[in-house]
């Protein structure tokens, strides 16, 4: 059986609080049965059954210990995609190790012991200043950090700063980039020049180019990669992870 790569995204990202959008269509057995046009209005996108994403909290130390016990029992070394800074409501940024010191220290020890691999999941996960929830409408489009429309200097600054924060804290080279929201650009690729990044992992290739990369490997999500968010683990616990492993005949 082919080895399965497990990857957890959105660690340390404030998108889990501020990426608020609603569910308009409801399905039964794959068929649309109900449409609610006000799902993105005010409080509706924060309540069941209209809430589609935020809000949920960061994983706690005790939750991480349970999750890692499952991975270790199955001899799996997961990829943990960390966003280097938490963007606050006022657009200020708090580095991951300062915002979540217990979680960060636990992950650092696991990384240094080769129990996990830390990947770069951006500096902010969002367009800073446009990340806050709207009274009406979805802000999901702005919870993508490496938009092709952004100036190349922004791509470069975010790559360099995120690498600086993560490598300084984890004390090892960070060699994988997981673009937030599976969106990245040729500008992002050029911004990686001179860093330790050797691989890009996500579901889609560059949004604005199909040029091959000379020095970086692209690993698409799909067969052989189980990518998910910390949201699933926060909401459904380690049992969700165990069930996923059973789907891959990992007992």
Indicate where each model-derived feature is located.
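Catalytic alpha-helical scaffold of carbohydrate-active enzymes acting on polysaccharides/glycoconjugates
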Residues: 1-176, 183-226, 233-251
């Amino acid at each position: 059986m082919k080895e399965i790569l497990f990857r957890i995204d959105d660690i340390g990202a404030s998108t889990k609080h501020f990426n608020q959008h609603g569910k308009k269509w409801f399905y039964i057995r794959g068929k649309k049965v109900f449409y609610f046009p006000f799902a993105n209005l005010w409080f509706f996108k924060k309540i069941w059954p209209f809430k589609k994403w935020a809000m949920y909290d960061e994983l706690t130390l005790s939750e991480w210990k349970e999750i890692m016990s499952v991975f270790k029992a199955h001899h799996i070394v997961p990829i943990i995609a960390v966003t280097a800074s938490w963007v606050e409501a006022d657009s200020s940024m708090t580095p991951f190790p300062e915002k979540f010191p217990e979680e960060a220290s636990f992950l650092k020890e696991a990384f240094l012991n080769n129990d996990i691999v830390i990947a770069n999941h951006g500096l902010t996960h969002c367009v800073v200043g446009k990340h806050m929830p709207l009274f009406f409408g979805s802000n999901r489009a702005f919870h993508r950090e490496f938009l092709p429309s952004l100036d190349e200097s922004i791509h470069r600054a975010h790559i360099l700063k995120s690498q600086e924060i993560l490598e300084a804290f984890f004390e090892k080279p960070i060699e994988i980039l997981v673009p937030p929201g599976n969106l990245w650009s040729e500008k992002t690729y050029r911004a990686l020049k001179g860093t330790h990044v050797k691989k890009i992992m996500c579901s889609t290739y560059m949004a604005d180019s199909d040029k091959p990369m000379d020095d970086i490997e692209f690993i698409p999500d799909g067969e052989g990669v189980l990518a998910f968010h910390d949201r699933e683990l926060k909401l459904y616990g380690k049992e969700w992870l165990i069930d996923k492993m059973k789907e891959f005949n990992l007992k």
